[in-house]
Amino acid sequence: MANRTVKDAHSVHGTNPQYLVEKIIRTRIYESKYWKEECFGLTAELVVDKAMELKFVGGVYGGNIKPTPFLCLTLKMLQIQPEKDIIVEFIKNEDFKYVRALGALYMRLTGTATDCYKYLEPLYNDYRKVKVQNRDGEFELMHVDEFIDQLLHEERVCDVILPRLQKRFVLEETEQLDPRVSALEEDMDDVESSEEEEDDDEKGRDPSPEHHRRNYRDLDRPRRSPSPRYRRSRSRSPRRRSRSPKRRSPSPPRRERHRSKSPRRHRSRSRERRHRSKSKSPGHHRSHRHRSHSKSPERSKKSHKKSRRGNE
């Protein structure tokens, strides 16, 4: 039958590779339209073409438990059991992120603990977004590094129960794995080393002689607190700079401003002056008034002639 595992396939974790998927989900995959139309007669070479057509990641969805194409291709790879080199090329493929995700899931299902850590941990540096279809049939966004973290730490991914994975520190103690160094730690080490080099360069530089002279001059001069007048001038200086050239007019306009006062104010001042002069020198004022009212000799002659004519 078309749903049987190939004859030369090796057992994985002591069982048939297809049995890594639960029976209910496996039967749903066999009955799906995608399995019958797209996965029939596929080989290891043709699976690559189908994997390149994937648009999202997911397990089953809906009330009828419909499988996604991603899960169907996973079961097909468990059925035909491609070579390890092909799976490694799937994982190292940087052009198609869904091909990489498919290879990572297959490696997690069939590979040893050492192979899983060796080939999947470098994918932590892949921050590309992938679409994931949940059980309700809705799509969500996820990054590739999140998907890899789920494969290494969770028990179920894409509705498939993952085999038990040995802890990493156990493999490190038995020297089967080297301690993991993340890319972030490497970047931090590079930054720290560059900062230390810059500090050493700054310490090695001698200050310029002008800087020394300036320091000696500052030490010789006694420090004084600025006078209030100096403070005012400094505080007013930016205002003066900001004034327009029209406001910087010289003193003559100010004099014109004093001259152009109201006539009423000028008259009041003249009256005050007259009043003061009256109070200080009354005799002088009277003589002045008498002089102003005394008739001139020509006027006296005219008045005398008029009086004669009247008498005549």
Swiss-Prot record:
Biased composition (Basic residues): 224-294, 301-312
Keywords, ordered alphabetically: mRNA processing, mRNA splicing, Nucleus, Spliceosome
UniProt subunit comment: Component of the spliceosome B complex.
UniProt keyword Nucleus, yes or no: yes
Acetylation found in the keyword field: no
Spans annotated as Disordered: 180-312
Name this protein carries in UniProt: Pre-mRNA-splicing factor 38A
Alphabetized InterPro entries for the sequence: PRP38
Biased segments, Basic and acidic residues type: 202-223
Source organism: Xenopus laevis
Coiled coil, from the record: none
Compositionally biased spans, kind Acidic residues: 184-201
Signal peptide: none
GO cellular component, one term: U2-type precatalytic spliceosome
Region N-terminal protein interaction domain, annotated ranges: 1-179
Family indicated by similarity: Belongs to the PRP38 family.
UniProt-annotated location(s): Nucleus
Gene name in the database record: prpf38a
GO biological processes: mRNA splicing, via spliceosome
